[in-house]
Amino acid sequence: MIRHIIYKYISTILLLWLLGVACGHAQKVVIKGKVIDDQKSPIELAQVRVEGTGCGAVCNLKGEFRFTCESADSMVVVFSMLGYETRKRVLENPVDSVTMNVMLPSLGYELGAVEVTDIRRQTSTMTDVSMEDMKHMGNASGGGVERLITSQAGVSTHSELSSQYNVRGGSFDENSVYINGIEVYRPLLIRSGQQEGLSIINPDMVERIGFSAGGFEAKYGEKMSSVLDITYKKVKGFEGSVSASLLGASGYLGFGTEKCSMTHAVRYKTMKNLLGTLQTKGEYDPRDFDYQTYMSWSPNQRWTFDVMGVISTNDYKFKPTDRTTKFGTAEDLKEFKVYFDGSEQDRFYTYFGAVSVTHNFNKMNSLTFNWSGFKTKERETYDINGEYWLNNDGDDESLGIGTYHEHARNRLNASVTSVGITGQNRFTSHWLRYGALMKMEKVDETMREWEMRDSAGYSLPHSADHLDLVYNMVSVNSEKSNHYEFYIQDTWRNEFEDGSLVLNYGARLTRWNWNKETLFSPRATVAFTPAKNENLTYRFSTGVYYQTPFYKEMRDTTTVNNNTTAFLRKDIKSQRSIHFVLGMEYKFRVNERPFKFTAEAYYKALSNLIPYNIDNVRVVYYGGNISKGYAAGLDMKIYGEFVPGTDSWLSVGIMKTEEKIDGGKSVPRPTDQRLNCALFFSDYFPNTDRWKMTIQGHYASGLPFGPPHSGREKQVFRMSSYRRVDLGISYRLLKNEDRHIYTGVGRAFRNIWLGVDVFNILDISNVNSYYWVTDITNHQYAVPNYLTRRQINARLLFEF
């Protein structure tokens, strides 16, 4: 009897226990709450997950989260976000609903007086470019942002006088630039770095720099190579700066409140001293000026109104006198002398404006209406005579004697007006973005240019029965067309037991009424960070990228009796590039300093290409889709605090690009640069924050080149490598960031910096292009056009 009672009791207990276990496994628990930082501000997109499961969520704009998960005896909830410390909370047998409010401290480390923060994980091809030491950086071209970009992986430059750059085998025209989400443009007639003037990007107004060398998102428009995405400041309070140097001056002023922000900036640039180091001597008188403003007003949380304006004037006057160039080898050294008569006078006036109106339905959904207008007026006029002598150095016997006359009367007016709307919707783990744009282009061009050469009394090219010019071109054309664009993309983030996944996918649809062309461009990027090693991230990007021809790509020519006429082709098509980019990123620490190593292997399948030649920074297109090719390479970059508290990086790129023109054999493209290395290094003196130093180093292997006005098959030569090191040193005369100075003139300033730059510190004679000399036997000599030599610049910066 007792045994029976015991068995019954034990059986009842076992049954109740089994029922409890079954009920426990089936029971759900709702986990919700909010994640904030140490300033009590919500942390958007913070990750909340239950360790060892697939349960989790991503915080919304308010830092709030909510998800449902199966309950357990013990649950470990992990809270994480890039740039913040990770926190874990343990829940013991939770039931029904649990509210968890967690604060994540900022991730920082103290090394003396220097604060070192963690490096953000990169889950897309868009890289955030550090601009901390840009104001201490020596820069000859005046384009401080672009000079930083040339030190990024996959980017190269061959002229310190120009702010243009090549990306992974693409031309200058294949790089798009956005300011506050609006695409901006460059002048079209520029043929040399001396003419280029100021970059449209004002470094004083920049808050953020994003750059992608390929595989970029669908929201970025119709360019094949790269995207530079600039965000201008919205200031709170009052700030400003005034700077002056031997190369120009600038002023910046910004003030704002919680609802209103306004910035104004002016720049003046003159490169007279720098151009004086060129081998062509004469009277250089370049004068560049621009004014920019950016204003933002938010009367309430629902509405935001933004206005941006740019006025830029660029006047270039040049009266050459003489030139002496020695070139060749030590065993075969030649000397080229020219005496000039005549002058050049160019004007490039640019106007740009944009208006944006944003309506926030709530913190998760918004719509923005955009209008922008761009207008350029360009004039290029020159009449230059030259008498030249070519002989062996130290020998009076002449290899070639002659004269030449270059003439141009070129005028171009262009305008681009766009109207568009963009929107975004945020969900728990999705970020949907979309937009539509109508763009209207109008270009009017009148160009007349020719070149005559005479060698020993004979006009070249020599003919017994008539007189010919080396080059004669006339172009009177107008273009008016409309573009229609639509894009949609989504970014999906999720946490799994094996790691975190970020997927960006989208597409563009475009229509161009010039040639009735409709294009579809799908794109996708996926990034995976394994849970076993959150310092490692793998990325893969692919997509179809079209480049709709702008005015220069549309021009074709016909030649009759040595007279060339330019016309616009109606059957021109968009060039196409299919990107495949496989990359990885690894974050690590050395002596408690953060570093990041990135590597990207890429292949670009190119079709419907419009071949071109490059002379200095001028790109001359064939005018037809007669080529196909490829670009393949490997880019590597190590970024981090080589010196505590400063950002430095070293990038190396290996690349090859070829094309087949009209089905012929493969030839190197004009941008076929096999090796490129760039260094940006910043430093300071120990135990003081008064001294700052930056070093920029560039090495780029030589590009293909050949005789002018000839086919690409004749470009069988290679330029010498481009090698340059620039040094910038700054000393802080006054430090008043904490406003501890209350009396005297010093109280008006936060900092006063005195700087010295040494451009081309190694004094290397780099070659930018070649001037070809022909004798009566039609033998040609390539005379190098050297760039600037060593030059010292002094600058003074007042910050208030």
Predicted regions and their residues:
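Short, acidic, small-residue-rich periplasmic hinge/interaction motif at the N-terminus
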Residues: K34-Q39, A46-E51, S80-E85, P94-G138, ...
